[in-house]
């Protein structure tokens, strides 16, 4: 008798399909979250690059301005040393540093 019993295979197959569907859905959601996170990180990195480029440009302008000021002060010092500190006319004031 037990050899003639037919097993109902439709139920386990439906369960397997439901499990597969559920796993696929969860995997797709995880993939979408990962891709979204990656896009956000790329955007954040691009913004940081832009910010650092602007900061670098500002610092380069400041370095240029300070180099000009240093050159001017060296010239003043050399003129003063050449004059041996004799009472001569006072040196001109340094250029304004309000450009930065």
Swiss-Prot record:
Lineage start: Eukaryota, Metazoa, Ecdysozoa, Nematoda, Chromadorea
- Report the protein's function: Transcription factor that binds to the promoter and the enhancer regions of target genes. Regulates expression of genes involved in fat metabolism, including ech-1.1 and fat-5. Has a protective role in response to infection by the Gram-negative bacterium P.aeruginosa. Required for the activation of infection response gene irg-1 following P.aeruginosa infection. Required to prevent P.aeruginosa ToxA-mediated lethality. May also function in concert with transcription factor zip-11 to mediate immune responses, independently of the pmk-1/p38 MAPK pathway.
Stated name of the protein: CCAAT/enhancer-binding protein homolog 2
* Variant or mutagenesis effect after changing residue 78 to I: In gk112657; low-fat phenotype
* Localisation per UniProt entry: Nucleus
| Region listing for Leucine-zipper, in residue ranges | 52-73
The protein's matches in SUPFAM superfamilies, at most eight in alphabetical order, are given as: Leucine zipper domain
Q: Which GO terms describe its biological process?
A: defense response to Gram-negative bacterium; DNA-templated transcription; innate immune response; regulation of lipid metabolic process; regulation of transcription by RNA polymerase II
Q: Which organism is it from?
A: Caenorhabditis elegans
Q: Which family does it belong to?
A: Belongs to the bZIP family. C/EBP subfamily.
Annotated effect of mutating residue 85 to E: In gk112659; low-fat phenotype
Where does the protein principally reside? nucleus
Record's InterPro entries? bZIP, bZIP_sf, C/EBP
Self-association state and partner proteins as the record states: Interacts with transcription factor zip-11.
Q: What cellular component terms from Gene Ontology apply here?
A: nucleus
Its keywords, alphabetically, are: Coiled coil, DNA-binding, Immunity, Innate immunity, Nucleus, Transcription, Transcription regulation
């Amino acid at each position: 008798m037990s050899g003639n019993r037919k097993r109902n295979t439709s139920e386990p197959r439906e369960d397997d399909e439901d499990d597969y569907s559920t796993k696929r859905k969860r995997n797709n959601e995880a993939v979408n979250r990962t891709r979204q996170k990656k896009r956000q990180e790329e955007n954040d990195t691009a913004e940081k690059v832009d910010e650092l480029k602007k900061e670098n440009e500002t610092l380069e302008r400041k370095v240029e301005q300070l180099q000009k000021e240093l050159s001017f002060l060296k010239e003043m010092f050399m003129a003063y040393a050449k004059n041996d500190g004799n009472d001569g006319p006072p040196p001109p004031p340094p250029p304004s540093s309000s450009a930065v």
